[in-house]
């Protein structure tokens, strides 16, 4: 979790005072990544000037540059990376002229983005979420203990701040890399279709299928772990509310982690929805191109036949056959079973948006009696009754609809007292709601 304690003017003055600047042309960036790759093979994490020159020689060969001035250009490149604080140079009086070099945190961060962050896989995500689950579980257990403020700092705040938050940031960064990779796939598909769409159909289909499969696997992994992580965070939050110590710093961190987790989980579903739309667009383009090309080829052949009739006479025979109806659905969801998964039988022919509209209408009608008869509305009891009628996967959506409709009816007098409402369970899976009884319509 990134926290900025300095103000914008302070950061600007700091950057100006230290003369920070980064300029990495393609050659310099390739050199930096070569250093990081070779450095990863060394136990001490240090490289000599000769090893850096050897790395630069590989880069120079890759860019087809002359080998006559390699030493001079390598020294210039090394000095440039040192000046930009991407490399640290260490010298000693005992070994004068034999400096050693280490990558700075900035250099590691840049190379990590270009090299390691692109290794985003379901296995890596599963391992990260597993570590987060263990840390959150330990933090929740520590929160249950009756400890002082130092105990909360050491056993709750520290793991959340320096382990869970950093892994969340790593997952968030990886998702942003996935966004770039999807854009790269779109560019590849566009290039294939512009060159020769006939030959590109199978390649486009493979790219679309692989990306859809990857997104679905990642989303399944996120959804499987999301509920457990959110439960641990809610447990810590409940403990904070009942603790006499001033734990606002922990409460704020937990709130930030909840928002981060929500963004991470929602990213997957949103990305899948956008990719389905793009998938349809590509297939519709291919179908249109096939139809247009078919007509264009026929028209071209007919034109040539008419022009060469006297050289090659021909006869036209036609039959009035029964018309064949094209039953293809232009709006067919392509590979929906692969992208969105199989629906249960009772929902097979229903869209979620239609279900949501129907549910809103039913809830609105059911809650109207409270306003008409001036009956106090206990939100926890109403939500408990509704959630019992639906599977667990729909509880969040149903609860949100019930709350949206309930708050439109009126407010609670006790809201104006400033006293917090009690947390009350609304299902068997640990979900709770905090709301006063609505009695003023």
UniProtKB/Swiss-Prot annotation:
Protein name: Chromosome partition protein MukF
Xref: SUPFAM superfamilies: MukF C-terminal domain-like, Winged helix' DNA-binding domain
Function summary: Involved in chromosome condensation, segregation and cell cycle progression. May participate in facilitating chromosome segregation by condensation DNA from both sides of a centrally located replisome during cell division. Not required for mini-F plasmid partitioning. Probably acts via its interaction with MukB and MukE. Overexpression results in anucleate cells. It has a calcium binding activity.
Compartmental location: Cytoplasm, Nucleoid
Record's subunit section: Interacts, and probably forms a ternary complex, with MukE and MukB via its C-terminal region. The complex formation is stimulated by calcium or magnesium. It is required for an interaction between MukE and MukB.
An annotated GO cellular component: nucleoid
One Pfam family linked to the record: MukF_C
GO BP, one annotated term: chromosome segregation
Renumbered residue ranges of the record's region Leucine-zipper: 208-236
Keyword field: Calcium, Cell cycle, Cell division, Chromosome partition, Cytoplasm, DNA condensation
Primary localisation category: cytoplasm
InterPro entries: Chromosome_partition_MukF, MukF_C, MukF_C_sf, MukF_M, MukF_M_sp, MukF_WHTH, WH-like_DNA-bd_sf, WH_DNA-bd_sf
Highest taxon of source: Bacteria
A molecular function (GO) term: calcium ion binding
Family of this protein: Belongs to the MukF family.
């Amino acid at each position: 979790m990134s926290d900025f304690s300095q103000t914008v003017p302070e950061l600007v003055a700091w950057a100006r005072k230290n003369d920070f600047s980064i300029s990495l042309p393609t050659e310099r960036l390739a050199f930096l990544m070569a250093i990081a790759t070779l450095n990863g093979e060394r136990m001490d994490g240090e490289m000599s000037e000769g090893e850096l020159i050897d790395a630069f020689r590989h880069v120079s060969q890759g860019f087809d540059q002359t080998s006559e001035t390699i030493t001079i250009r390598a020294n210039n490149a090394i000095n440039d990376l040192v000046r930009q604080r991407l490399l640290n140079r260490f010298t000693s009086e005992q070994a004068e002229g034999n400096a050693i070099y280490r990558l700075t945190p900035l250099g590691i961060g840049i190379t990590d983005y270009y090299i390691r962050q692109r290794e985003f896989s379901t296995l890596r995500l599963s391992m990260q979420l597993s570590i987060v689950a263990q840390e959150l579980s330990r933090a929740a257990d520590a929160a249950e203990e009756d400890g002082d403020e130092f105990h909360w700092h050491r056993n709750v705040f520290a793991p959340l701040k320096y382990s869970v938050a950093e892994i969340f940031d790593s997952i968030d960064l990886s998702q942003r890399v996935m966004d770039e990779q999807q854009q790269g796939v779109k560019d590849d598909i566009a290039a294939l279709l512009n060159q020769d769409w006939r030959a590109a159909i199978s390649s486009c289909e493979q790219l679309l299928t692989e990306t859809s499969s990857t997104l679905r696997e990642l989303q399944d992994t996120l959804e499987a772990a999301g509920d457990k992580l959110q439960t641990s965070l809610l447990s810590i939050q409940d403990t904070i509310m009942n603790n006499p110590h001033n734990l606002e710093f922990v409460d704020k961190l937990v709130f930030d982690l909840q928002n981060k987790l929500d963004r991470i989980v929602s990213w997957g579903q949103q990305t899948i929805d956008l990719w389905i739309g793009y998938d349809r667009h590509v297939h519709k383009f291919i179908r249109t191109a096939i139809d247009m090309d078919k007509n264009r080829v026929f028209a071209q052949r007919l034109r040539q036949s008419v022009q060469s009739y006297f050289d090659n006479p021909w006869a036209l025979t036609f039959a009035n056959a029964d018309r064949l109806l094209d039953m293809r659905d232009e709006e067919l969801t392509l590979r929906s079973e692969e992208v969105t998964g199989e629906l249960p039988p009772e929902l097979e022919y229903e869209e979620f948006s239609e279900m949501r509209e129907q549910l809103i209408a039913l809830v609105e009608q059911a809650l109207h009696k409270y306003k008409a008869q001036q009956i106090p509305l206990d939100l926890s009891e109403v939500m408990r009754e509704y959630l019992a009628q639906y599977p667990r996967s729909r509880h969040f959506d149903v609860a949100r609809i019930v709350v949206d409709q309930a708050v439109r009816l009126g407010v609670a007098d006790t809201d104006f007292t400033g006293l917090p409402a009690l947390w009350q369970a609304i299902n068997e899976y640990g979900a709770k709601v905090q709301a006063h009884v609505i009695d003023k319509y």
